[in-house]
Amino acid sequence: AQAGLTGGEGLPNHRTLYALPDGPQVLAEGADSVVLRLRALEGRDVEVTKVLTFKRGSYVIDVGYEITNRTERPLATHAYFQFARDGRPAEAVEVFGVSTFTGPAVYTTESKFQKVQFEDIDEGKAKFVPRASDGWLAMVQHYFVAAWLPTEGVQRENYMRRIGADQYLAGVIVPVAAIAPQETGRVSTSLYA
């Protein structure tokens, strides 16, 4: 799973290094969650903190950004949340005569569950809802799934593409409201993993 911001120079992407705060970062006895606040090590005009919230007993991780605009002009940006995977099929497994699926999938209320074969991405024939205000995007392998779960009602753009020899991205882009000078904006989504 990868995440980052787009739309301006100096904004962190999925390769940006972050610093942890000093001291232990643990889920305390009796606590329901722990919040990790990671500070991006690059950027002077824009300060970015990645906020990860882990909840006891949950497979859902909240992933968010706090973006402080230190410039004298409004900042327009988007956040992306994606999965990177090779296109090799997982070992062949057949259950009751049915082969399992490996690849990206999108779910929306309107179009339901849409599995996409890596070959269809290669050939430009991938069929999935590119824009929606509900649903999720996942990477599926056999019985395992990881999914980005954007907030319901938030317009998002789903994408899938080949990025190299047998390497693929599947992700979702969500808007961040324009951030005025010297103000802080926030964006978040959830990761099921």
Can you describe what each PLM-predicted range is?
Residues 1-193:
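Soluble non-transmembrane domains of integral membrane proteins
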